[in-house]
Amino acid sequence: AACFENNVEVIVLDRPNPLGGLKVDGPPLDARWKSYVGVFRVPYVHGLTIGELARMAKEAPGIMQVPGATGINVSEAVRARGKLNIISMRGWRRSMRWPETGLKWIPTSQYIQDFAAVIGYPMTGLGTELGSFSHGFPGPLYPFRGISHPKINDRQLEKELRALNLPG
């Protein structure tokens, strides 16, 4: 936002989506839940690269308006005149997941320290937004590898789930 407002070109060095560019799953973001972690009306698992997301932000009217969020609200006039330069990747194919790129993993947050956490995030990250659930065992030691709740007995839950004979 600050770059666009001050006529400074934004340069994005595109990088692979760790889950690949073909995996798309989940409903698109409901506009009522826009926040600094979810602005785009794309599925929860979207398959887009950071460059594609940046282009979407630049080209989609209204997408950079998030009431109450700081640092990302940009007027339509500023968005339209902002300069964006995306440097494309070489050698990446949409079918490639992170391990196939041969690139070194650099943690994207304190909780996403490795590719295992990337795989688990879509499955467990949303569940932890539902109240007292945790996405680590214990705390941040193994984030996004499962969920826990202080009032749920894991053995009893496992027994009840097995009794349902669910496929998979």
State where each predicted segment sits.
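Cleft-lining beta-strand/loop regions that shape enzyme active-site pockets
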Residues: A1
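Conserved anion/nucleotide-ligand pocket segment
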Residues: K34-Y121
